[in-house]
A protein has these predicted regions:
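Catalytic cores of secreted or luminal carbohydrate-active enzymes
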Residues: 238-285
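Aromatic-lined carbohydrate-binding/catalytic grooves of carbohydrate-active enzymes
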Residues: 17-126
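Aromatic-lined carbohydrate-recognition surfaces of secreted/lumenal glycan-active proteins
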Residues: 78-95, 141-159
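Structural recognition of the beta-strand scaffold that forms the well-ordered cores
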Residues: 1-5, 34-40, 79-83, 114-119, ...
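Glycan-recognition surfaces
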Residues: 100-103, 142, 146-256
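Solvent-exposed beta-hairpin/edge-strand motifs
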Residues: 325-343
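Carbohydrate-binding surface patches
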Residues: 238, 244-247, 252, 289-330
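C-terminal beta-strand-rich structural cap/linker in extracellular carbohydrate-active enzymes
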Residues: 349-371
């Protein structure tokens, strides 16, 4: 869980802005809630490498260097994240890591970087796609530093190929794994793919079923206050973070923390949502479809369950949740007792089935236990 300043600041990033954002994360209780990464993007270096092929820090923007910045963030309980590219250039035109994975990985480690967002950008047609990923994986491992490796792309076959090549699938608090991987798909809802004709919410809903047994990759980056993604409404934001939580999918908020509203902070720091997201067992959810909605159920520790219910229609509807599909036997005499994590409203105890009334495209996230 963390924040990215790439969209809000872009090339205007500098040391003061980063430390100000970090202080705001602490002030709003976001760090205490578990938002531990802060991505400063790709504009921290100069547009050209030095004579030895190394990336050069921009000392105008970061007069004390990234190593100082990393230490300053660590003192606040925050870890430093940066963006690099699979290809020749980064999104803002800075040097990419193609064919320089090992030298860049060493640089990142020396600068105290904790998280690498490896973006599929400016890849030469003959360079291939998967070999640079494997090289960066090996290069980061070779540094001996604990660096979180996140892949950011939109590629229809990437999950199958990553599984085939032996990459690890980890969920929940991926920072607990030395070589964890977050498959962060730049969904159409981020506005990256301008050719998409769907609305942001339609695109987001279309990817809710991107789920593979044993794989709980990142649903998306959430852009707050962005014209391409309307998360100003607390219920819209709650739906998006709930989808991430039920899939143990890391949440990266693409916004300046200072721009958050009080309601947005309440949603992002909700203890029930984070409890589901960071459950130590990190189980993939079961998906139960009906005519008008979808129910995701996930086994949690302490004999509890996460339940995410979505109305898939354009009208108000009552989405059924059948305990038989969930795995209960009617003769067991067990009952389901659950509450809405965002409102704390308790749902009536039920045995065979429940109907969850939702507005058009609405959702609710519950924590449930059997009694």
């Amino acid at each position: 869980m963390g924040f990215s300043l790439e969209k809000s600041l872009g090339e205007n990033i500098d040391q003061k802005a980063v430390l100000t954002a970090a202080d705001k994360m602490v002030e709003l209780g976001l760090v205490a809630a578990g938002y531990e990464y802060l991505n400063i993007g790709d504009a921290w270096c100069l547009p050209s490498r030095d004579d030895n092929g190394k990336l050069v820090e921009d000392t105008t923007k970061f007069p004390f260097g990234l190593k100082y910045l990393s230490a300053a963030l660590h003192a606040k309980g925050i870890k430093l994240a940066i963006t690099t590219s699979v290809g020749a250039l980064t999104p803002n035109g800075y040097p990419g890591s193609l064919d320089r994975e090992y030298i860049d990985a060493d640089t990142f480690a020396q600068l105290g970087v904790d998280y690498i967002s490896h973006v599929a950008c400016d890849i030469p047609a003959t360079a291939g796609f998967f070999t640079p990923l494997r090289r960066m994986n090996m290069a980061l491992r070779a540094t001996g530093r604990r660096i979180f490796y996140a892949l950011t792309f939109d590629h229809s076959k990437i999950m199958d190929r990553m599984y085939y090549t032996g990459y690890e699938w980890d969920g929940a608090d991926l920072s607990e794994y030395t070589n964890g991987y977050a498959i962060e798909k730049w969904l159409r809802s981020t506005g990256v793919n301008s050719f998409c004709t769907k609305s942001p919410d339609e695109a987001f809903d279309a990817h809710l079923d991107d789920n593979i047994i044993g794989y709980t990759g990142t649903q998306c980056w959430l852009s707050l206050g962005d014209v391409t993604v309307d998360c100003e409404c607390a219920c819209a934001l709650a739906k998006k973070v709930s989808a991430c939580a039920i899939k143990c999918s890391p949440i990266i908020i693409n916004a300046d923390p200072a721009a958050l509203t009080e309601k947005q902070v309440e949603v992002l720091t909700n203890k029930g949502m984070i409890r589901i997201l960071k459950d130590e067992e990190s189980r993939a959810p079961a998906v139960l479809k009906s005519d008008n909605g979808t129910v995701y159920t996930k086994l949690l520790t302490d004999r509890e369950y996460g339940v995410f219910v979505i109305n898939d229609t354009d009208n108000e509807a009552s989405v059924p949740f059948y305990t038989f599909d969930f795995g209960m036997v009617y003769s067991s005499e067990l009952k389901c007792d659950m509450y809405d994590v965002f409102t704390n409203e308790k749902h009536p105890v039920f045995t065979d089935a429940a109907r969850i009334k939702l507005p058009a495209k609405g959702s609710k996230l519950f924590i449930m236990k059997l009694v």
